[in-house]
């Protein structure tokens, strides 16, 4: 009541709307203009009266009254004196909440440097003055004097003088001949006297002259800061403070605790230090104290102000009474507990409850069970309102009483209130948007929330004690959004990959699988049924079993909706499932006439969703769930010990392997193989044995057996559970019935002795001990993994949060080329899977018939995909978010289908956040480790090529010879074998390694799976193209070649060793030369001599004087990969790719097409040049470390983008050399590979959205007529804007190359400083923004959440759109008025726009 009366007298001022927020450095005048008075005393409140002291930190005269409308001395009380200032105590009579708004200030007796501009690297003050930070600190903290005005003396400007040097200089030159100052005053003078325009001009001219890169960078940094100051209107001397602002007292409260003690904010202590020291300094100056004392006091003042702004940034941390560091102003903003992340982005919610969840199988998909007690509490305000409306109560107090007594009418009203009022259920951790969904509450007894079993997958919930939170959407708009967008029935598909997420699991799958099994010789086999009634009757009378082969009539409808029926060979169980299928011509009985494994059930639901729409799907899912549960119950599948079958051959397999291991031990003891080789072989042998046992076991379990009457025996229960996808994996079955196999040590190495027993036999003590390692490491890993995965998600969300669908179509002609991903002859991702739901960039035509499949700019749907794959189209150009040309966000056509809805994406969809969630959510399923697998197990290198399609061979860049054995050998380094289908369309194209044996030639026909090339994966050969006699050059025993004999075989081999390590060998160039019959060096086809340089470690395959013919091998270099290499896998690999880090030994990529030439070598680097093939291109030179295996020969032709040195390529190189498209396909494929290993499906477009955000910056290569400097990193959008205005004025535009930034860097460089500051390095971001006077236009989601507005996505996006239209309209009217056409013509215009928003656009 009181509040309402108050509102009559001071009506609520509507919150001002604003479009942007600007941050800059506060000038002393600005600080004084905020202030309501100076704080002169460090006192806070009087210990007897508890009233604030006058002029103290809580002074009521400055900050306002403590009680509403009451001055401090009590002379004026109540509203009627509003606005009067009491003459006794000087307090204005007003609301006490002004104590949260009014600021004060402290006048400093000596200027003080602001620590952010001093210490936040790079130091702004130091860069601006072009001095080192150390020197500036020396001056500021009173260690050295600085010469500001040398006069005619021999001193230099900005020279530092120690105390003694200063005294000597004064004696020598006299005090008035030069000026040297100390402390912040000195820096203030220097900053104030700077002429920024002149400095900027000098820097620009100096940059034009300088040649050194380092100098250029330094000048650029300084110029940037100078320009920032000029553009933002900040003055450099404002970085030195003469006035310190004091924040309002209610934001740093002093609270009395019981027992006469006080709890206080740390800021009060920090302010008190500043005031004390400041007052003492004033007094000392008045007393004319000696200079040294005053200097010490000034230094202490500087330190206390530093501590107030950023405690611990410089010097010791200032601690409070309890020895813990005091929280300074910076600490209030920083980190997870700071203002940004704790309070602005992490608000708590009212009207919420949480409880344990239990399963609710009788609920419908859109319902959840809400305990009555909980509902009563959550919906209280609604209940009070209804009680009042129905006349049960006249006041809130009465209503409260009724509810507390739980009167029967209250329950009736609760039912009314809850009807169709959705509530939100949330399960932490909310890793993706399906972690919060809306349901209609059904009141239940008890205290547990009931959850529908089908939504468990989305929430990742189970019923082993999980808890969930309930939230009530209050406003009508919120209820509407909950119902339309968040209802569980609207979230049938997974936003990450578009597959159904409402899929039966566990028991339901088992029940359906059991129902759909077909067995032989069951009772009733061969019967025929005309309708379901007959079938149910026969089942009841046991004339037929669920699994018998029968013929049944399935009734459905055709395209016109007329009933049709067809007879199928099926089982009664499958007929029962078919009964539930919606009647639709596109959902045939075949969808369920098969074994219903989890995969098939998912496909079935997908088919139903695509053809019958959402409503039918939801009903179908509910019925399928009921069916699954009831049949799981009836089947009563369980397993006993005997269901775990141990294969009989296990003993033999283990025995054979043990013998093999013994043999290896013997070889090692005889010194034939090294320790490492033995280890690898042993591990490999046991690995194979484990696999073999597992295979035998699976074969036993799967086997179909019959009983004496010839009826098929029931299937093995464990196999059923695993095969149906209900529970358990083949791996777990192997541990139960096969052998557990190899275990890892905590270090990640594999223990040589495996665990031979399985769980059925039981483990020996040793085996048990060995297996504890792995179990413990698994638990430790899980904890680390969760944290890492969460951090990755946070970085992804931060980088992509401002990526929103803002326009329908950007009309770009750029896009990506999609092809199928083939790995080792297996198609991992077909072209159809990759292009489904994307927009075609060009028309897609059938290459044979020429008929149009998809028009350019249209979305590729399921039928189109089938047509494209049938037509054998190999590559399709599609639009992608990566190449979208909209300035902010992306356009709908480039993005394509909204995966969670199966329709084109809506305007205002926050696709960035969805992408981040889709990539981050499966993060916890990825592994954490770097694999150190021993042994041949990891020689993943392929050693052959197989045809993945049938067709005709065509060889690109054909360069082959027949060697002396008559086998074709590839001599070219960029040969490719293509397979064409009967219509001449290329189905696949594979590069062939140099030296491969080729079994096909142009025009040959190949069958699928036929091997057409193979090579040795462990060595790379060096072959001759000419015939002749072998001669060695510089091959000197003991210096460049070492001979060794293999003891087991007695064969000697000669291997090249590093000849440069000995003084005698420095000038040798070991090579093999081929001479013709006249004794001259033979000539190669491409014009060089037949001289083959040998690399270190090459093994010679020929003897001097030996005759060789074309294609014969002269020497072999062992390949690195034959050794086991560590593969970074899982989460660390994904993070490495998104952070765009350079790999340790990264590949070197050729930048141009051309010929390899060797230059003069350096001490431990080889010089390799590429002579360009085209004219007018500069040759490129690379330095390659000598120890690295290098396989190219002098004169080899190499194409742009080929690897000169093998390894993982650095993404930056791919971008620079091959461009954005190649980079995108590299990153997408590498990231997908990690997820694919874990069986996680993520749509490519999500990764593309993130990569788009990583490519927002451009490095200027040609500044044109702009103000940019070459080497500047600018925003892509900003560059486009600048160029548009340059072109409009007829000037030369600036050009830039795209730059790839890692996600952390990209987040910190977003145009929005609010978003960047709330991410990481808060002080640094804010310092930078303040110096540049940045403006935040509030375009992303995060900034808007922080300032407390609707986000510009979804419903908020529409509001933004409407506001934009309104502003445009206002501007139009103002323009009219300005032109002087008067208001008359503008008024009708206004009316038009109000009726037709499109006109306003």
UniProtKB/Swiss-Prot annotation:
Annotated binding of Zn(2+) 1, by residue: 71, 73, 86, 89
Domain of life, per lineage: Bacteria
Cofactor note: Binds 1 Mg(2+) ion per subunit.
Gene Ontology biological process terms in this record: DNA-templated transcription
Binding site for Mg(2+): 462, 464, 466
Cofactor: Mg(2+); Zn(2+)
Record keywords, A-Z: DNA-directed RNA polymerase, Magnesium, Metal-binding, Nucleotidyltransferase, Transcription, Transferase, Zinc
Alphabetical list of Pfam families matching this protein: RNA_pol_Rpb1_1, RNA_pol_Rpb1_2, RNA_pol_Rpb1_3, RNA_pol_Rpb1_4, RNA_pol_Rpb1_5
SMART domains: RPOLA_N (SM00663)
Entry's Gene Ontology molecular function annotations: DNA binding; DNA-directed RNA polymerase activity; magnesium ion binding; zinc ion binding
Catalytic activity of the protein: RNA(n) + a ribonucleoside 5'-triphosphate = RNA(n+1) + diphosphate
EC number: 2.7.7.6
Region Disordered, annotated ranges: 1377-1401
GO cellular component terms, A-Z: DNA-directed RNA polymerase complex
Membrane-spanning residues: none
Binding site for Zn(2+) 2: 810, 884, 891, 894
Function per UniProt: DNA-dependent RNA polymerase catalyzes the transcription of DNA into RNA using the four ribonucleoside triphosphates as substrates.
Family: Belongs to the RNA polymerase beta' chain family.
Matching NCBIfam families: rpoC_TIGR
Subunit structure: The RNAP catalytic core consists of 2 alpha, 1 beta, 1 beta' and 1 omega subunit. When a sigma factor is associated with the core the holoenzyme is formed, which can initiate transcription.
PANTHER family per the UniProt record, alphabetical: DNA-DIRECTED RNA POLYMERASE, DNA-DIRECTED RNA POLYMERASE SUBUNIT BETA
Name the record gives this protein: DNA-directed RNA polymerase subunit beta'
Organism whose genome encodes this protein: Rhizobium meliloti (strain 1021)
């Amino acid at each position: 009541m009181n509040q309402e009366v108050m509102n009559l007298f001071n009506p609520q001022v509507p919150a001002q709307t604003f479009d942007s927020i600007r941050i800059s450095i506060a000038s002393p005048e600005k600080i004084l203009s905020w202030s309501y008075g100076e704080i002169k005393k460090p006192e806070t409140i009087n210990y007897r009266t508890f009233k604030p002291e006058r002029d103290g930190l809580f002074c009521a005269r400055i900050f306002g009254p403590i009680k509403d409308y009451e001055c401090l001395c009590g002379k004026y009380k109540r509203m009627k004196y509003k606005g009067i200032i009491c003459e006794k105590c000087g307090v204005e009579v007003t609301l006490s909440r002004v104590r949260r708004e009014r600021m004060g200030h402290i006048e400093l007796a000596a200027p003080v440097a602001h620590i952010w501009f001093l210490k936040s690297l790079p130091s702004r003050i130091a860069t601006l003055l072009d001095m080192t930070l150390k020197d500036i600190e020396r001056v500021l903290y009173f260690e050295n004097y600085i010469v500001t005005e040398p006069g005619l003396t021999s001193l230099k400007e900005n020279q530092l003088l120690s105390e003694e040097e200063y005294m000597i200089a004064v004696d020598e030159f006299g005090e008035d001949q030069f000026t040297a100052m100390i402390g912040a005053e000195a820096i203030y003078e220097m900053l104030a006297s700077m002429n920024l325009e002149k400095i900027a001009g000098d820097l620009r001219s100096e940059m034009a002259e300088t040649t050194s890169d380092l100098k250029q960078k330094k000048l650029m940094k300084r110029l940037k800061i100078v320009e920032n100051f000029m553009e933002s209107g900040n003055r450099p001397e404002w970085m030195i403070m003469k006035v310190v602002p004091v924040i309002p007292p209610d934001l740093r409260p002093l609270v009395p605790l019981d027992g006469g003690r006080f709890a206080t904010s740390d800021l009060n202590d920090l302010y008190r230090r500043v005031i004390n020291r400041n007052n003492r300094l004033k007094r000392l100056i008045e007393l004319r104290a000696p200079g040294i004392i005053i200097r010490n006091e000034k230094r202490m003042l500087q330190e206390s102000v530093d501590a107030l702004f950023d405690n611990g940034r410089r010097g010791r941390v200032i601690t409070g009474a309890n020895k813990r560091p005091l929280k300074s102003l910076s600490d209030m903003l920083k980190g997870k507990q700071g203002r940004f992340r704790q309070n602005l982005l992490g608000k708590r919610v009212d009207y919420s409850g949480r409880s344990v969840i239990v399963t609710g199988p009788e609920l419908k998909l859109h319902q959840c069970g809400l305990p009555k007690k909980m509902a009563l509490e959550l919906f209280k305000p609604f209940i009070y309102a209804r009680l009042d409306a129905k006349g049960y109560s006249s006041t809130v107090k009465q209503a409260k009483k009724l509810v507390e007594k739980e009167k029967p009418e209250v329950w009736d009203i609760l039912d009314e209130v809850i009807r169709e009022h959705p509530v939100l259920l949330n399960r932490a951790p909310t890793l993706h948007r399906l972690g919060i969904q809306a349901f209609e509450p059904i009141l239940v007894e008890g205290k547990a929330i009931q959850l529908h079993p089908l939504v468990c997958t989305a929430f990742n919930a189970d019923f082993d004690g999980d808890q969930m939170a309930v939230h009530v959407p209050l406003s009508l708009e919120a209820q509407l959004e909950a119902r339309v967008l968040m209802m569980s029935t609207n979230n049938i598909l997974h936003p990450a990959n578009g597959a159904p997420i409402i899929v039966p699991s566990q028991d339901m799958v088992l029940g359906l699988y059991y129902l759909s099994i077909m067995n032989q010789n069951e009772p009733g086999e061969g019967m025929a049924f005309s309708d379901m009634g007959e079938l149910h009757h026969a089942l009841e009378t046991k004339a037929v079993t669920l699994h018998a082969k029968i013929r049944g009539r399935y009734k459905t409808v055709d395209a016109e909706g007329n009933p049709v029926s067809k007879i199928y060979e099926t089982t009664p169980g499958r007929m029962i499932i078919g009964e539930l299928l919606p009647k639709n011509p596109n959902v045939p009985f075949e969808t369920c006439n098969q074994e219903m494994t989890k995969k098939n059930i998912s496909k079935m639901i997908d088919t139903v969703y695509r053809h019958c729409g959402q409503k039918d799907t939801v009903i179908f899912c509910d019925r399928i769930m009921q069916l699954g549960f009831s049949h799981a119950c009836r089947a009563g599948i369980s397993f006993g010990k005997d269901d775990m079958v141990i294969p009989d051959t296990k003993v033999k397999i283990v025995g054979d392997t043990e013998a093999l291991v013994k043999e290896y031990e013997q070889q090692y003891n005889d010194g034939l193989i090294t320790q490492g080789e033995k280890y690898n072989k042993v591990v490999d042998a046991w690995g194979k044995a484990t696999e073999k046992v597992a295979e035998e076991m699976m074969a036993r379990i799967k086997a179909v057996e019959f009983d004496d009457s010839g009826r098929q025996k029931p299937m093995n229960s464990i196999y059923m559970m695993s095969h149906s996808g209900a529970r358990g994996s083949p791996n777990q079955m192997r541990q139960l019935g096969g052998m557990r196999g190899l275990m890892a040590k905590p270090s990640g190495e594999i223990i040589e002795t495996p665990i031979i027993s399985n769980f059925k036999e039981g483990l020996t003590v040793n085996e048990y001990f060995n297996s504890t390692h792995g179990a413990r490491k698994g638990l430790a890993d899980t904890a680390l993994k969760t944290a890492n995965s969460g951090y990755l998600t946070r970085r992804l969300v931060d980088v992509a949060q401002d990526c929103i669908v803002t326009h329908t179509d950007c009309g770009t002609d750029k896009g990506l080329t999609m092809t199928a991903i083939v790995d080792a002859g297996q198609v991992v991702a077909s072209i159809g899977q990759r292009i489904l739901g994307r927009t075609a960039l060009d028309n897609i035509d059938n290459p044979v018939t020429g008929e149009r499949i998809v028009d350019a700019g249209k979305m590729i749907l399921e039928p189109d995909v089938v047509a494209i794959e049938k037509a054998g189209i190999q590559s399709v150009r599609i639009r992608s978010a990566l190449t979208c040309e909209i300035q902010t966000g992306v356009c709908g056509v480039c993005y394509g289908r909204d995966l969670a809805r199966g329709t084109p994406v809506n305007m205002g969809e926050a696709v960035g956040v969805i992408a981040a969630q889709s990539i981050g959510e499966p993060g916890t399923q990825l592994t954490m480790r770097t694999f150190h697998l021993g042994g041949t197990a990891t020689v993943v290198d392929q050693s052959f090529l197989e045809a993945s399609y049938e067709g005709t061979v065509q060889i690109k860049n054909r360069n082959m010879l027949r060697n002396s054995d008559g086998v074709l050998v590839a001599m070219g380094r960029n040969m490719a074998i293509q397979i064409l289908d009967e219509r001449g369309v290329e189905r696949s194209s594979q590069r062939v390694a140099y030296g491969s044996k080729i079994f096909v030639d142009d025009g040959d026909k190949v069958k699928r799976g036929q091997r057409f090339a193979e090579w040795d994966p462990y060595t790379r050969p060096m072959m001759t193209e000419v015939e002749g006699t072998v001669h060695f050059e510089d091959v000197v025993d003991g210096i460049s070649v070492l001979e060794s004999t293999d003891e087991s075989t007695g064969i000697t081999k000669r291997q090249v060793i590093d000849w440069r390590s000995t003084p005698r060998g420095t000038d040798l160039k070991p090579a093999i030369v081929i001479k013709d019959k006249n004794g001259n060096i033979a000539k190669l086809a491409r014009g060089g001599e037949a001289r083959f340089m040998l690399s270190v470690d090459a093994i010679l395959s020929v003897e001097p004087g030996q005759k060789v013919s074309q294609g014969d091998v002269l020497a072999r270099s062992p390949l690195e990969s034959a050794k086991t290499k560590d593969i970074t896998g899982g989460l660390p690999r994904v993070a490495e790719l998104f952070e765009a880090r350079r790999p340790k030994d990264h590949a070197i990529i050729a930048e141009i097409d051309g010929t390899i030439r060797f230059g003069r070598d350096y001490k431990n680097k080889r010089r390799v040049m590429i002579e360009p093939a085209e004219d007018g291109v500069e040759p490129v030179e690379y330095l390659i470390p000598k120890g690295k295996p290098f396989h190219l020969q002098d004169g080899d032709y190499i194409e742009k983008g080929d690897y000169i040195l093998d390894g993982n390529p650095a993404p930056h190189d791919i971008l620079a050399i091959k461009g954005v498209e190649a980079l995108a396909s590299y990153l997408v494929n590498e990231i997908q590979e990690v997820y694919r290993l874990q069986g996680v499906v993520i749509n490519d477009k999500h990764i593309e959205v993130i990569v788009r955000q990583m490519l927002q910056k451009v490095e200027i290569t040609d500044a044109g007529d702009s103000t940019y400097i070459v080497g500047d990193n600018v925003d892509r959008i900003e560059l486009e804007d600048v160029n548009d205005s340059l072109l409009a004025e007829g000037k030369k535009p600036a050009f830039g190359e795209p730059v790839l930034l890692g996600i952390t860097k990209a987040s910190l460089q977003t145009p929005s400083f609010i978003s960047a500051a709330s991410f990481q390095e808060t002080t640094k971001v804010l310092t930078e923004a303040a110096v540049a006077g940045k403006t935040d236009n509030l375009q992303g989601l995060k900034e808007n959440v922080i300032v407390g507005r609707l986000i510009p996505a979804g419903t908020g996006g529409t509001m933004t759109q409407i506001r934009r239209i309104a502003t445009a309209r206002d501007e139009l009217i103002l323009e009219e008025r300005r032109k002087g056409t008067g208001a008359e013509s503008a008024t009708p215009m206004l009316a038009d726009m109000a009726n037709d928003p499109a006109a306003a656009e």
